A protein has these predicted regions:
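Primarily mature extracellular domains of secreted and cell-surface proteins
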Residues: 45-421
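Secretory targeting and sorting signals
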Residues: 1-44
């Protein structure tokens, strides 16, 4: 039954009235964030940073090791980090084409290396990146070198002795990696595979010293994991316009926001919403160790057209309590963790506003606890994905509540898939 049908039959069917209350409560309760959209409390998930439903945004700092060669001979091994950010879908259909979009990255060379520059009078460098390869497990192709045939070239990079040297790509705009073709099922992991840079170190005296940096991952190299399932024949997934406002992560860490599509049952009728989770997340876990999310928070997203339909039903405000947002752990313990604290997260009574999508920080201030997650004996990886969610909702200030139950997304939506090292 549709919302309109429920309305037409409400006089003779108490369940229809209950349905209307539930739907209004779910979307209306979300409007509590309207006052927070312009100035969200510290540490809450900023609504303006939440991507569209179905979008995964993130920034990753991966440890790498670069073999530095001069005239074809290895000179030294340089451990450093590659800092990469981008956008991808949270789910894929069988055989669906997809891209990693809005990509950018940088490699930072340490200050001790630039401290050697004055010895040779080195003041500038030119860089030519000939290989930047991103892999996609079980996909076709399995990897793409985005610099193949069109190397990235950076001229006249200033070298300041004793200061870190950051080489970023591209100089302007962003890059897209793809298309890849998804497998028939399972999951796809996008990963940093390889990078090669040819660098000319230039001196004030007019001579140059050509070196080559061949860089490979030295720990985990996964960027993100995407679940595959559902109906075949889906349109290519090449996403644009997602917000990317992340701070620089720590080494071996990601900072990201995943906005997963959910179907919630309220009063017997399904309602599509988005549930977003953002956090700082380690990218590897040691055998015998554990990992946790830090600065974790969530958000409920209600589309504007749903808000408008509920206003048309005669509702202007709602309230409630979120009681569950479960994380499911594969390859580790606990098997399930509810990140909503005991007593729930309150949603104060608030108005609905026509033509306005609602993004509700959960909680409206502070953060959630997620973890620790411990690898199971013999596990090669530990993945954390979004599970079911639930709330108790009320409408119009009434004392009664209506339960809202939201099943886990299908295909699976992963927050992280960490190798056990």
């Amino acid at each position: 039954m549709t919302i309109s049908e429920a309305r037409s039959r409400r006089a003779g069917r108490p369940g229809g009235r209950r349905l209307r209350r539930g739907l209004a409560a779910l979307a209306g309760a979300a409007a509590v964030a309207l006052a927070l959209v312009h100035a969200p409390p510290a540490r809450a998930l900023p609504p303006q940073d939440v991507p569209a439903v179905g979008v995964d945004t993130g920034r990753f700092k991966l440890p790498i090791g670069c073999t530095i060669t001069l005239a074809g001979l290895p000179v030294f091994y340089l451990p450093t980090d590659v800092d990469v950010q981008g956008v991808a879908p949270v789910q894929l259909g069988p055989g669906q084409e997809f891209w990693l979009t809005q990509g950018s990255g940088s490699i930072t060379f340490p200050s001790w290396l630039t401290s050697l520059a004055p010895i040779l009078g080195i003041t500038e460098a030119d860089a030519r990146v000939t290989d930047l390869t991103i892999g996609a497990s079980d996909s076709t192709p399995a990897a793409i070198n985005i610099a193949e045939g069109e190397p990235f070239e950076i001229k006249d990079i200033a070298i300041e002795a004793g200061k870190p040297l950051k080489v970023g790509l591209p100089l302007t705009g962003t890059f897209d990696v793809g298309p890849y073709k998804a497998p028939d099922g399972g999951k796809v992991t996008l990963a940093f595979d390889h990078a090669v840079a040819e660098i000319d170190l230039k001196s004030q005296a007019g001579f140059s010293l050509p070196i080559k940096a061949d860089c490979k991952p030295s720990a985990g190299n996964a960027l993100l994991t995407i679940g595959v399932g559902g109906a075949p024949g889906q349109a290519p997934a090449k996403l644009t316009g997602a917000p990317l406002n992340f701070p620089e992560p720590a080494s071996n860490e990601l900072v990201g926001i995943v906005n997963a599509p959910y179907t919630c049952t309220v009063g017997g009728e399904p309602l599509d919403v988005g549930i977003a989770v953002g956090a700082h997340i380690p990218l590897v876990v040691r055998k015998g160790g554990s990992f946790s999310f830090t600065e974790a928070s969530g958000a409920l997203v209600i589309p504007a057209d749903t808000v408008n339909r509920l206003i048309d039903e005669g509702y202007g405000s709602a309230s409630g309590t979120v009681t569950a947002l479960n994380l499911e752990i594969d390859g580790g313990t606990p098997a399930t963790q509810n990140v909503i604290p005991s007593g729930g997260v309150p949603i104060p009574r608030t108005p609905l506003v026509r033509d306005r999508q609602i993004t509700v920080p959960l909680p409206s201030g502070g953060t959630l606890t997620a973890g620790p997650f411990t690898p199971a004996s013999g596990a090669q990886s530990v993945s954390v994905r979004l599970g079911s969610a639930a709330a108790n909702l009320a409408f119009g200030g009434g004392s009664g509540t209506v339960p809202a139950a939201c099943g886990a997304p299908s295909p699976k939506v992963y927050l992280v898939d960490n190798p056990v090292t």
